[in-house]
A protein has these predicted regions:
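Short, conserved catalytic/metal-binding motifs centered on acidic residues
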Residues: 29-35, 51, 142, 163-172, ...
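Short, conserved micro-motifs enriched in small and acidic residues
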Residues: 6, 188-196
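Conserved, well-structured functional cores that handle cations and Mg-NTP chemistry
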Residues: 1-53, 57-60, 67, 129
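Short, solvent-exposed helix-loop connector elements
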Residues: 41, 144, 150-159, 173-191
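An anionic, glycine-rich sequence signature occurring as long contiguous blocks
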Residues: 1-5, 50-164
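Intrinsically disordered or highly flexible coil/loop and linker segments, enriched in small
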Residues: 25, 164-169, 181, 207
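Hydrophobic alpha-helix feature that most strongly marks membrane-spanning transmembrane helices
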Residues: 160, 164, 173, 177, ...
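Short, hydrophobic/amphipathic alpha-helical patches that form generic packing surfaces
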Residues: 193-206
């Protein structure tokens, strides 16, 4: 009765806040577009944490303080890029080898980290990372926040870490029965998931 509905972005913010308050060591956060931006972005910036966060094709981007001007939706900006702006990179290894895509990165604004926390120093960059599927040209978009000079190779590698989470879910479902649960109560669901996660942790150590 004390559990209230919460959106995925608010759940993610609460998770990040708990990690920060208990000094969990981490430098990057990667997420797909379902988690949104805005509050998550500000939470991470104020904690001096880097991020690669998925956004929709309609998300707007604008450059400032740069020698070049960029303004428009993520989709419009990607469509206007010349072919030599793209770089073929692997975001990590999958079951069939390297996950190769074409990538483009635009650093849009350099900001003083001190604007987000009195103890922070240095220049950080807000950017737009774009992933294009080699086979069909389908594109995905990410807003980024990282120290100035961070390479596109680093950003693509961080984005690729999300796949490990998806692989873990698949393993937990196929081998440990994560989705084999039809209880309707919170306690029943929570106990089932907790036991599956314990089993998953044990198998990860054994392997």
């Amino acid at each position: 009765e004390t559990v209230e509905f919460a959106t995925k972005p608010s759940l993610a913010c609460a998770m990040i806040q708990r990690a920060l308050s208990t000094d969990v060591p981490f430098s990057w956060v990667a997420a797909d577009s379902v988690y949104g931006v805005g509050s998550i972005e500000m939470t991470l910036r104020r904690a001096a944490k880097r991020y690669v966060l998925g956004v929709s094709s309609r998300h707007g981007f604008t450059s400032w303080g740069k020698s070049y001007a960029v303004s428009g939706t993520a989709k419009e900006i990607a469509a206007a890029l010349p072919e030599d702006a793209w770089k073929r990179l692997s975001s990590g290894d999958g079951t069939k080898g390297a996950r190769l895509h074409d990538w483009a990165y635009l650093d849009l604004a350099d900001l003083d980290a001190g604007d987000f926390g009195a103890d922070f120093t240095g220049t950080w960059t807000r950017g737009l990372l774009i992933r294009r599927n080699i086979a069909d040209g389908d594109t995905s978009y990410f807003t980024t926040w990282c120290p100035q000079g961070t390479s596109i190779e680093t950003l693509t590698r961080i984005e690729g870490h999300r796949w490990a989470i998806e692989d873990s879910f698949e393993t937990a479902k196929n081998e440990l029965g994560l989705d084999h649960n039809e209880t309707r109560s919170w306690h029943g669901w929570h106990r089932h998931v907790s036991l599956v996660m314990l089993a998953f942790a044990m198998t990860a150590v054994i392997r």
